[in-house]
């Protein structure tokens, strides 16, 4: 049965030919399905070190594939030492899921702005006399 997935994988920063490895991994996903969207996010910093590395090449693929193709992708990704991490989401199971890397980036900026506003938020200081006047009204 073909389902919709969002697959993200991180490649080692020391990989010489990332395009070749990306095309190999994408071919595995497309073997029993089709790739709807493929986004290369480039070399990004990790939040914490993974295998003594501080950076990696991020790649996101939105694909319609069978579970067999996904399992085969995960198996090969575990074997290949150049693949640092993988994440596979079955987007059909997530309610109100919007599949777009561009949207994800804008959502993160909105989230960061909200957090900044919360961090800088202070209750306004109201003198007791003013508070008593407001309560009596």
Swiss-Prot record:
It comes from the Bacteria. The keyword Ribonucleoprotein applies. GO terms for cellular component: cytoplasm; ribonucleoprotein complex; ribosome. Pfam families: Ribosomal_S6. One of its GO terms (molecular function) is structural constituent of ribosome. The keyword DNA-binding does not apply. Keywords: Ribonucleoprotein, Ribosomal protein, RNA-binding, rRNA-binding. CDD domains: bS6 (cd00473). Signal peptide: none annotated. InterPro entries: Ribosomal_bS6, Ribosomal_bS6_sf, Ribosomal_S6_plastid/chlpt, Transl_elong_EF1B/ribsomal_bS6. SUPFAM superfamilies: Ribosomal protein S6. Coiled coil: none annotated. One of its GO terms (biological process) is translation. Binds together with bS18 to 16S ribosomal RNA. NCBIfam families: S6. This is Small ribosomal subunit protein bS6.
